[in-house]
Amino acid sequence: MMENKMFCYQCQETVGNQGCSQVGVCGKTPETAGLQDLLIDVTKGLAEVINEVRCKGKEINNVYDDQVSENLFITITNANFDDQMIIEAVRKTLTLKKELLLQLDDQAVLSNRALWMEMDIEAIEKRMQMVGVLETADEDIRSLKQLITYGLKGMAAYNKHAHALGFRKDEIDRFIETTLVKIETSTMSLNDYVALTMETGKYGVQVMELLDQANTSTYGNPEITEVNIGVRNNPGILVSGHDLKDLEMLLEQTKDTGIDVYTHSEM
C-alpha cells in the first residue's frame, strides 16, 4: 500500500469514492492540499482567540471576521491552488491573531493551535505534516467534523459575497467562529456533532437569505431574459462562479472595449 501524500475527500469525484491520497483528481497537488489543511488549522486558531476576546466583553473588528470567511473560501473545491497566496493567507492570519492575543492577559486557557505563531517556511512545512483530515482517528467523528467544516466553507463563500455588497449579519460570523472551535473540543460526543451538523444547516439557510437580500437589493430580482448564447470573433472573458460584484466590476471595465464577457453557472 502506498503511503498517503495527502488526503482529501471534499468533493464527489475522489479516487474510488474514498479520497485522493497521492494527487487530487482535480489536479490539486499534495503540497497545495497540505497548505489548505494548514490554513484551516490556523483559521481555527484565530477563531479560538476571537471567541476568547469576545468572552472578555471586547468588540471584534470585522477585519478578523472577514479573514475567517476568506480563508474558508480559499479552501473550497477548485477555488484556489496558488500555493504562495495560501502561504500569504496563513501569515496574514497569524499576524491578525497576534494582534488579538495582545488583548488577552491570560493565555493559559488557549490551545496549542491558538498559540502557534511560526511564520518561516520551514515551520510552515513542518506544521503541514501535523494537521489535516486524518488527525482525527475516529471515522464517525472525523466524518461529522468534515461535514460541518464543508458546510462552514459554503457559508463562508456566500458570506464573503454578501460582505462585498455591504451586507453582513454578525450572528453568522459568530456561528462560523464558535463552530470552528467547537469541532475541536474533546468533550464533544457523536450526538453533539450530529446536533451541530443540523445547526450548521440552519445557519446555512440564514447566509443564503443574506446573500439573496444583498443581490436583489443591489441588482433587483432575477427575471427571465433572452440572451445570445453564441460566440463571436471578439476577444472574450469567461466568468465562472457567483460573485455578482466581481461581474459588475468586470462589465464596467470592459464597457465599449469590444471584449465579450461570457458567463455560466449561477451567473
Where are these predicted regions, by residue range?
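Metallocofactor- and cofactor-centric catalytic cores in central/energy metabolism, strongly enriched
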Residues: 2-267
